Amino acid sequence: MRLNTLSPAAGSKPEKQRRGRGIGSGLGKTGGRGVKGQTSRSGGGKVRAGFEGGQMPLKIRLPKFGFFSRKSLVSAEVRLNEIAMVEGDVVDLSTLKQAGVVTKNIVFAKVVLSGNIDRAVTVRGVSVTKGARAAIEAAGGKIEE
């Protein structure tokens, strides 16, 4: 016995039905497609997502709202516990990028009160929230605008 000589037992697999080959086959005439309509046609039923057959699509019926701020693509929030990952006493945009806290495309960063900081750091050129400012100054650090 070899792998290339194996075949299924006789009668274990039904023969493929040939569509549209007469009434006696059970799938004659319309071949299981029903009568008329888009899905009965060759290549029919393939429509793009959101297409509603010519009816005004839901996406267009609903009103437009809001906008996408492009500044959000170049802005980031920095938590206090992420500042602890920065080596050295001075924290600015370049040191945050070197430490991998923010990505290289970030232009604006803001330190927010989340987590805690246990060492004195000087935050330079990065905006800081009131709560984060209090926490940094309580740890002996300072903020330079």
From Swiss-Prot:
Source species, domain of life: Bacteria
GO-annotated molecular function: rRNA binding; structural constituent of ribosome
Disulfide bonds: none
InterPro entries in UniProt: Ribosomal_uL15, Ribosomal_uL15/eL18, Ribosomal_uL15/eL18_sf, Ribosomal_uL15_bac-type, Ribosomal_uL15_CS
GO CC terms, sorted: cytosolic large ribosomal subunit
GO aspect biological process, one term: translation
Database matches in Gene3D superfamilies: 3.100.10.10
Record keywords, A-Z: Ribonucleoprotein, Ribosomal protein, RNA-binding, rRNA-binding
Spans through the membrane: none
Composition-biased stretches (Gly residues): 22-35
Ranges where the record places region Disordered: 1-50
Similarity comment: family membership: Belongs to the universal ribosomal protein uL15 family.
Function comment: Binds to the 23S rRNA.
Subunit structure: Part of the 50S ribosomal subunit.
Protein name, as recorded: Large ribosomal subunit protein uL15
Organism phylogeny: Bacteria, Pseudomonadati, Pseudomonadota, Gammaproteobacteria, Aeromonadales
